[in-house]
Every structure is written in structure tokens, then in C-alpha cells.
């Protein structure tokens, strides 16, 4: 880019071949601001007449995005809920030297990295409730003070199948009862709520510590991923014999 050519406006060329006339021409490198609004064509030659010359810079020089991904999987790595994704974008203006292709990041014409909408935070993410399973964390923590050089955030929440109340009895006449899967806590993916203890007529239920569980009661397991054995014992049976006079119909003795 021409600055001055050293050629006076009133100069007259002479006809003396033996005397040089000297002029000093001042040139400077042309500088072009580049940003997401005016990105030029990344990778294309700055000077179309020089296809092997300097190229316009890649977009990451002035436009960066930090990504967050939270995956929800079971113990085998199978997806159990939709991924959570988020992103924070940063932009700036750089200046490109049209002669060398150098990307200038400070000084006249440049701007510092700025977060879109001023957002530099990934909010905490509450883990979704997955029926029949519990998560190893109720939420992923917030990530604050992100900048253009921050690494992507990748989190994994692992789910484990919930346990059940398992009825059991050593009594040979025990009719059996269905297992009861622990209900999920709808407000916390890491917890279950108390499970209803099956009622079996003629039998009394006991928890693993031997405590009697009344009919219709509910039991809160200490570990939501472990089965709990509920032991049933036969109730003591009582009977009576009455003696009746066939003639009078009166009860003589009980």
C-alpha cells in the first residue's frame, strides 16, 4: 500500500542520460480487520493473483465456541436419557497482514475476546429421573468464568438399576408374594421412596433386622441399588371345640 512516492508535483524530467534522478517510494503492508461479521474467506488466498501466497486465517482465530456435553448412561455404557448440551461463544476482531498473512491480535484495529450476550457460565444441570434406575449424582456442577481458551466440558452421569423388596419364607405353605421394585423419587434422581410391603394373609412380615412390618406399611431401603429380603413367618393359629346337646341344641362346653 503506497504511503508516499517521493515525486514532487512540479518536477520536470531532464534529458541528461548521465545524471540519475532519485525518488524514494514509501510502502506499507496493508492490514485488514477480520471478525465473524467480516470473515473474508478462510483458507482462500489473500491476493487472488497469488494462489500460493498467504491465506485468510481460519475462523478459530476470531470465533471460538466452548461446548458442554453431559451424557447419561447405565453401568454398561448404554444411553438411558437424552444428552444435555450447551455452548458459550466468544468473538473478537483481529488484523491480518495482507503481505505476510500474519494474524495480529493486539494493537490498533483489534478487539479482545468477548462472550456472546456476556454469558461465561455453564449452569448446573439436574440429572433426569430414569424409571427403575438411580443416578450417581443429583446434578453436574456449574462451570463459571469460561474464556476463549477454556476446554470443552464433558461429564457422564451413571445410572444403576434399583433394587426390590423380595418376599421370603421358610414355611412350606407360604403362598409367595410378588417382588416390589423401589419407586423412584420424582424430585431426586439419586433416591428412591419407601416401597409398599406386600400383605400375605396369615403371615407377618419382618425386615432384615427382624422388626415387624405391619400390613400396608412401607419400607425405606438403606441402599437403593440393593435388594431387601422381607421374611414372612406364619401367624400362630388358635382353635376351639364346642360340645352341643343334639336334643336341646344347647352348647354344653367350649
Predicted regions and their residues:
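Extracellular modular ligand-binding repeats in secreted and cell-surface proteins
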Residues: 1-254
